[in-house]
């Protein structure tokens, strides 16, 4: 069960998506609650296994901005849209702050927009399945059918 302030409660499976050039992939789904903020490393590894290309930039929701993920991104030279903790260095290049802003805006428009489309037009937000197997199939087709359009 998931909820957001001022939003209706959602039941059923919880899905952790990644997007590569606008195409959604299901990285993890479960009928048990999980914290997607702890799955950054798995998301990066999954994307690298799909594309064969090292990840250099990631746009993520604020739930991913924990210390462990910040350290992982720094160690692997991955630019993120995370807001800095504390005061930033005075000599930070304008390109870095500009990249953070662009990555954040792209994530917000593309990723959140795809969630809205999946829920509204492809039935992902509706309770239509009567068991876990049917719901898993509905999620798969609802998320992946948008790719072929």
What are these regions (language model features)?
Residues 11-23, 85-90, 114-118:
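A glycine-rich, aromatic-flanked flexible loop/lid motif
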